[in-house]
Each structure stands twice: as structure tokens, then as C-alpha cells.
Design a protein with these regions (language model features):
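Cys/His-rich metal-chelating microdomains
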Residues: 175-178
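Basic, polyanion-binding surface patches
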Residues: 1-164
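Short cysteine-rich clusters marking metal-coordination/redox-active sites
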Residues: 169-172
């Protein structure tokens, strides 16, 4: 029963990068510290995300660790639209870290800046192993977990009277109707 995978404990994050002067970001749920010395993290990113391609070329990224105060609109903004179709920095509040990349502060409790030192091809995703170059605590608010998101933040889709073809993403709840 693959539902057992939902019992793994992990957070939700805004992953940002930049390439050729264009900033972008997406929601990811797989960021973890893998070593303390050197301080390294790993992040798995879907190859279909523009942010993936930016990180693959630029070799740098930021992770904003979302807190329990985060709103569904944040997940919708960063995770339910493509950076190829929209400017994700338009009409949002953000800051830049020492590496020049964007991080969000309002709904995050910390950010981490990192430089890629290794890449592992996982088929649909790439696992980026990266050395932490900067990190900062923003607030003491608890980090949002995937379980907390589903119980307290995620909006339940309204029932439709007309059936449409599509799918619902099991990770973020995004509904694609084609």
C-alpha cells in the first residue's frame, strides 16, 4: 500500500534559483541535511520544473523553510503555476541573500543558501547534493510538515457538476483539468 509513504515525515519548502537574470522558484518536499562537516543538504527536484533547469546550470539555490503560518496562496503561487508562463516574483515580498538569490521571509522560519557539489539522476528527478554557504533563522515558528499542510492548510477542492479529465497531484494537491 503506497499510502505508507505519506507517513514519512518531511517539510515543505520554497526552492529558488536564478539563471541569466531570471529568478524562479517552486515548492519541494524533499530537503534534508545529509552531512554536518561539511554542512551539506540534498534536495530532489522534478526535472519538469524550470527551477530544476536553473539549478542544473547555475549550481546555486536557496531554500525557504515554510512555517505553520504559511497560507495556501503561497503553495498555489510557487507550486501550481509554471515559471515559464509567469513571473513568480511579481506581486510578492521577498529578500535576497548574500548569493543574490531570492528567499521569502513572511511565511518562512529560516532560509538556506547552497552550492551544488554533486548531482544524481533519479529518472524523473535530480537529487542535488549541495554545500551550505549561508543560513539564517527568521522566526521561531514551527516548520510546516506535509501532514500539517494536508490537515490545516490545503484547500479541499469543490465538487464539480461536470466531470473533466485530469489529475490531482498527491504531493501538493494541484488539480490539472485538461
Amino acid at each position: 500500500n503506497n499510502n505508507a509513504m505519506f507517513n514519512l515525515s518531511y517539510g515543505l519548502f520554497v526552492l529558488t534559483s536564478q539563471l541569466n537574470g531570471k529568478d524562479n522558484g517552486c515548492i519541494v518536499n524533499t530537503v534534508t541535511q545529509v552531512t554536518v562537516s561539511p554542512n551539506q543538504i540534498a534536495v530532489a527536484v522534478n526535472k519538469q520544473n524550470l527551477t530544476h533547469d536553473m539549478i542544473k546550470v547555475s549550481g546555486v539555490f536557496n531554500v525557504s523553510i515554510l512555517s505553520e503560518k504559511s497560507k495556501f496562496a503561497t503553495y498555489k503561487h510557487w507550486g501550481m503555476q509554471s515559471g515559464t508562463d509567469t513571473d513568480k516574483l511579481e506581486a510578492i515580498t521577498y529578500k535576497r541573500s548574500a548569493n543574490g538569490l531570492v528567499y521569502i521571509e513572511d511565511e518562512a522560519n529560516a532560509f538556506i543558501s547552497a552550492k551544488v557539489v554533486n548531482k544524481i539522476d533519479l529518472g524523473t528527478h535530480t537529487l542535488f547534493i549541495a554545500e551550505v554557504t549561508d543560513c539564517e533563522v527568521i522566526s521561531e515558528d514551527p516548520s510546516v510538515t506535509y501532514a500539517y499542510y494536508h490537515k490545516n492548510i490545503k484547500e479541499v477542492p469543490q465538487a464539480k457538476t461536470e466531470a473533466k479529465k485530469g489529475f490531482i497531484c498527491v504531493i501538493c494537491g494541484y488539480i490539472y483539468e485538461g
